[in-house]
Amino acid sequence: GKVIREISSREEQIAAGETKQVLCEFEVNHPHLWNLNDPFLYTVKTEISGQDNVESRIGIRSIRFNENSLFELNGKVVKLTGHNRHQNFPYLGGAMCDRYQREDADILKYQLGCNFMRTSHYPQAKSFLDRCDEIGLLVFEELPGWQFIGDESWKQLCYQNITDMIYRDYNHPSIIMWGVRINESLDDDDFYTKTNALAHELDPTRPTTGVRYLRESSFLEDVYGFNDYHLAPKGELRRPNYHPYFVSEYLGVMFPTKSYDNIGRQVEFARRHASSLNAFYRSSDMAGATGWSAFDYNTHIPFGHGDRVCYHGLTDIFRIPKLAAYVNQSQADAKESKPMVFIAKYLVPAYFEDHEELDQGYRGRTYVFSNCEEVELFFEGESMGRLKPDDEAFPYLPHPPFVFEVPYTFQGMRETTHMEAVGYIDGKEAARFERKISVRARAVKLEADYSTIEANGYDLTRVVVSVVDEHGQYLPFCQLPVTFTLEGPGELIGENPLGMEGGRAAVYVRSTMETGVVKLTGKCRDLDSCEIQINFVKPNGTFVS
């Protein structure tokens, strides 16, 4: 790229084993600012006497919380909306390759409509943060910990953790706050006065924050973070009692929802997300809100489910979206992302499923999530109306749900039953979504995210596994097992056989050091099987074997 500035420092003498900081200051005239929609990055090359060099990417931007307690990026107010991310993947935990660390950032921004996220509850992979820089996703990064505060030697490790975090990640323009309080811990004013001062000493350019579940707590940081679950059953949020203030967690813990729960619960989970977002946008002095959580995750205690999985996410642990994910996706501006429309309903001829909906008030009611101006819903080819969004129930939401009354029951379904939603912007069709009735399982479907990966021993691709009907739709309540065979120089990571969860699940295919073609086959009883191929190619860069 074009060199815009070049400077040299004074000569420094550094003894063997010594560490020294050398400050070089320079100005960039008329800089290209880093922002959400144009995350421009500069590269700074630092060289030591022609012997060694390192390249760092930076973004030039200004951040602050203004007198109205709102966040400003480059002088413009940004309402911080996002979710928490546990760096946890099925079968691999946190030890996932860079490809999928980066992809999580893409999911947060482009599939879940986030402009902001929290690294709960620890610093996360550099490759993830690099991707946040590249796509314009704001980050709150915090020191490791959860609830427990130890003795003085333990606290010394916390000081070191803060130091390491800030030194490692200082150059990331996406990071806008440092978390200097152990998540959900009790007050310890002496300890947290020191952590706050340390962060300010190491980085005076960024505000500090801390996350607590205490409504009345010592406010020692620059921004008050609060885990707000008190009004979750109503989908509400409390009013700020300190300023600046943001909600660091909401909803998920209080209404865990599996991808294979009944439709009534799944829709209610989505509706509560819409209601919580509506409450956030209603507040004129709440800087941000991050829901709990983006993805389901493994846990070390049961949390009531007995399988060591927390079902608090907008997606399942495989990053397969639940219905609620589309509430968040629909909040993105159609001009900045793309128009979308989604029917939050399955057409399943199941007696008990229909009656569970009746118990929870959803029989005949169909929610449609869209960022279009109008939506028309068709059932069996007949229009159920062309509606505006429900801004009476969700008056502050950028794009409220559309609610249709559709008079159907399972007894009236036929093999040709279908439902279609059409979204309109400026009176013209902008998006379309269709559901057909699911009657019986017909085939196994395998979909690899990537058909080509590097043969370096750690690169991999996710393979989404589905049991589908005659229309190619996954069966939302199917639990059948799929058995795999793998041919070629690869490794299958996951369960074999693998039971479906809501008709879908996933495995991973990891490369070895050998190039070639891998064939993965999925079989389930007498259903049509499926085979895919994945190419392992020579690595593009250097690696450590």
Across the structure, where does each feature detected by a protein language model lie?
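Substrate-binding/catalytic cleft of secreted carbohydrate-active enzymes
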Residues: 104-331, 336-356, 364, 390
